[in-house]
């Protein structure tokens, strides 16, 4: 959409290489705490699902942490679980309209959802908005000590500094991610932050690659299949951070991945090997 172009034109290429980094569950150890203490409980509350609480929390965790859809945008995750709730637990009013919005909007953000709600008056959209705001408020309430980077991240960022441009690319709320990077002193290592307000990860990566980097000079670091797909669609390389082996992944990137990326030996066997480990780790 119109906004994306703005975001990209603010960015200036200053090095020959570009590294894009996802935040939640990749650079930041925030995935479990946000999903188990914020997203899932707020869902149970907003749709009054107390009697199915354990099932719903388990289902939310499976969709958003332990499957192919790990790390997807919150509204996509919400639509997915509401479909299951509607089929197996209790009727969800207005679900079709919410699903239609999720599938067709060019921006999966609160602002875009609010515009759609004002247009349609759909009850499910209203609840989705209230849920999302509740989630934001509850994330703010989590203490900073529970929202810190994985071990190995800062060391890797120090090694990258000066060698590649660095952009945080997240499907989360931009304000929240900026605050987390600032609080942990990592924002100084990043040149730009692109979030759900900027557009999809694919759009963000594509617009960044249009800044004149050579082939195989752009790398996405992520922990979810969605990150890999975004990298592929922008013809970028992909380095996976393995769920529950994050520190090891970052240490290996610092020791080997980065060097290969800068020397041009990342594509091919090394990347294929990493992606194989990535899929095996998520049981895909």
What residues fall within each predicted segment?
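Short amphipathic alpha-helical segments and helix-helix/interface helices
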Residues: 154-158, 205, 228
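C-terminal accessory extensions appended to soluble enzyme cores
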Residues: 255, 259-284
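Short, Lys/Arg-enriched N-terminal segments with co-localized hydrophobic residues
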Residues: 1-3
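Short, basic/aromatic recognition patches
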Residues: 5-10
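Extreme N-terminal starter segment of soluble prokaryotic enzymes
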Residues: 15-19
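Acidic, Mg2+-coordinating phosphoryl-transfer loop and its flanking beta/alpha structural elements
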Residues: 214-259
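Substrate-recognition "cap/lid" segment bordering the active-site pocket of phosphatases
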Residues: 167-219, 229
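Alpha-helical substrate-recognition element adjacent to the catalytic core
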Residues: 14, 26-175
